[in-house]
Regions:
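A glycine/threonine-rich phosphate-anchoring loop and its flanking beta-alpha core
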Residues: 1-68, 160-163
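Active-site segments that bind and position negatively charged phosphate/pyrophosphate groups
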Residues: 58-185
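Generic detector of intrinsically disordered, low-complexity, polar/charged segments
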Residues: 2-3, 105, 132, 192
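C-terminal hydrophobic structural anchor segments
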Residues: 174-206
Length: 206
């Protein structure tokens, strides 16, 4: 609730278009974790994935010596992975877990981690098209697209993929290509662990 973006969908034309403006930043925002208590597990999972991909698209580009921004992003990614199991548990929601999840998701898109660094929102742009055409939940399109973008752009993103592998997942053994493969696999496994499929075939597509 602290960002400056939005999306407009027009079902008649199968269009889903994003927009943002500095004028859309709120003067203040109120974040109440208890408002998440009535969300079904599917939407909690969607929130985890969306926040993860928001962070990745401001992080997984190329090195620009933005040391603090890199560490901010890596910390958010690790926090989401840490919070996910408890967030997805059945039973009464845990206030501290939801508070940390809400704050982490907020920091993933309020402009902090993207300040002064290159960004790549290709995953979101492709995901928007899948939602507009096939009605797949937004976050679920991202879980399908991000691993494929990581694979397709692995040479252009090699340095940051290796950094991501080491700092987020602790992957330090093997060749560079093996470490990148392992990092992509861990990303897929994380999405799948919260019940979010990573293949179009899960939606009878492709």
């Amino acid at each position: 609730e602290m960002n400056n973006g939005g999306v407009v969908t027009r079902k008649a034309t199968h269009a889903k278009l994003a927009f943002s403006s500095p004028l859309c930043f709120p003067q203040f925002s109120v974040l109440d974790p208890t408002k998440t208590y009535t969300l079904p597990p599917r939407q909690i999972a969607n929130g985890l994935v969306d926040a993860f991909v928001h962070t990745m698209e401001q992080y997984l580009t190329y090195p620009v010596n933005a040391l603090a921004q890199d560490r901010f992003a890596e910390g958010l990614l690790q926090t989401l992975v840490e919070l996910a199991p408890r967030a997805m548990q059945e039973g009464a929601p845990d206030y501290d877990n939801r508070a940390n999840l809400m704050w982490t998701a907020t920091l993933a898109l309020n402009g902090l981690i993207g300040a002064g660094v290159p960004q790549d929102w290709a995953t979101h742009m492709i995901g928007h098209e899948l939602t507009a055409l096939y009605g797949i939940d937004h976050a679920r399109t991202l879980a399908i697209v991000l691993p494929q973008v990581m694979q397709a752009r692995r040479e252009a993103k090699r340095a940051k993929l290796l950094q991501y592998a080491e700092r987020v997942w602790g992957i330090t053994e093997g060749s560079e290509d093996a470490r990148i493969d392992a990092a992509i696999a861990r990303t897929v496994a994380f999405f799948e662990s919260v019940g979010v499929p990573t293949r179009l075939s899960a939606y009878q597509l492709g």
